Amino acid sequence: MNKKSIIGLLLVGVLTFMTSCADMFDISSSRVVYDYDHTLGSSADSVYTTVGILHAFQQIADRYVILGEVRGDMVDINKNTKASLRNLAEFNFDEDNEYLQIRDYYKVINNCNYLIAHMDTTIRHNNERVMTDEYVAALSIRAWTYMQMALNYGKVVYYTNPITKEAQADVSKYPSYDVKELALVLIPQLLPYMEYKLPAWSDLQADGAPVTSELFPPIQLILGDLYLWLGDYQNAWLTYRDFITDNPNSLMRAQTGSETTTFTGYMPLGNGQVKTDNRMTGRSFIATNFPSYVNGLNGILGGKGEAITVVPMQESTEDGTVSEVPGLFMSRQNTHQLNGSALWQELSLAQDYVLGAQGQPTGGVRGYSYLSNKGDQRINYYVREMQNEEDEFEVIDKFVGRTRTTGTSETYTIGYLTLYRRALVYLRAAEALNCLAEQQHDGAKAVQAFGILRDGFDILFPNGSIYKAELQPYTLGVHARGCGDVYLDTAKYVVKDAVIAEFYGKEVEDVNFTDTIHYVEDRICNELALETTLEGNRFTDLVRFAQRRGADYLASKVACRKGTENRDEALYQKLLNKANWYLPTK
């Protein structure tokens, strides 16, 4: 690998300082000053430098979704798919592929390094350090970016000083880390800042609209992810648990607030749209379009919002980076390049939709029934049937925020891409707890981990506990978002030997502790697909599960994109070799 070529390209435009902020992401060459020895000694310096980092961060946001989903099992290519995407899906990695440009990641890294190296965090105003928030933000973005690079490329060249001179670009002096080695380096760096605030600016827009801290990955969640990849499941579980219990508004709540009424589904979509399904009143749609990322964040990240961290995208290239993702999945003329896979449809249809009986419970027990042939309903929110003069076809409108028509062509845009949201934290907490159950040979913890899917988070803690007091009542299990009143189900969506035996096609008496752990793990893996599909996590989720279960776990899923009866044997054999999972560096 030619490491020098990777980072040497950063010498053009190492860092940007904005001289004004009419549009926070407009960093054109006529408005940029480069000063490699400049000390960031004012709050304005720190804010505008951080904005420069966010601009660079935008440029890798699409990559997060595309690399994470096109290589996974829930997305498939079609006749329109361009060569670069097709090669990704088939794991034929050409160094000239537009999606493999590692320099864009190092641009983010180098900008963060510059801010961290030059910011004066000792400056105080009213006895408060005024630039610490931006310092922590740079730490968080740098750590998250390094983690993504290690996951995608297998190893990452690691450096912490800004490269501003050609002599510094000889990176043979720098170490290369895989994700576990990287975790051992990053965790001690991040731990001292776990309780620090991220920036929450309020004076950059003429109308005073705030730019919230949700533009930055929380240190606590990055730590949770690093612990999870490292295999430190005790600390991973505690970190995720503490984030959820310390942030009560990060809980998914039942919309009704009563155990005797029907829970509603809750589907977070792109650009601030939310679709809900209330079976008592019929389907309703709540949709709010946000033309600017600043105003949009107020709505989507409010007290009841789903998103935790987002990357705002623009509607026009004149304003900044426009996401390619919506147009890859959506078209009215059957020109889209990516589809949901047949395996996604199979998985969704295999679920049981549970409908609680109406009225008051009898004898303290509420009845329920299964709705036949319904399956998980989340896929129906995301997939739209279309028809033109020639074809009937399906598209995915999960990412479409706005549509712009020019003549016969249409352009689809999205207001933001999501890095962290509540359901994802729930599911990673469940994964960590189940892995901890295996380490400690504690079946009760495995049942608790499954409970996060089935019952919600508050059931994990007894009444009167320090955590219970902070939790909202009647939190919603993740699986309920697509499958109804699953908390009532005592026959199918449960951890019982008979259910586990049927799940794996074995005799009840042969079910053992390992089967229980694997059953819960498989349910979590399936739920990650059902809940977070198309959002960028899928392939690396499969890699993480395969670290515990073997290469076949990943290979067998990805090779069955076209359905379990249509396994791609050549692709399966290729993916049994873990070296083929990772991207080449240019």
Regions picked out by a protein language model, each given a short descriptive name:
Residues 1-19:
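Sec-dependent bacterial lipoprotein signal peptides
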Residues 249-459, 521, 545-586:
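Elongated scaffold/linker segments in the mid-to-C-terminal portions of large proteins
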Residues 21-69, 237, 554, 560-586:
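Membrane-proximal, proline-rich intrinsically disordered regions
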Residues 58, 148, 152-155, 229, ...:
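Alpha-helix C-terminal capping/termination sites
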Residues 179-182, 196-207, 251-299, 359-365, ...:
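Surface-exposed intrinsically disordered loops and tails
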Residues 47-48, 82-154, 174-184, 191-201, ...:
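Conserved, well-structured interaction surfaces
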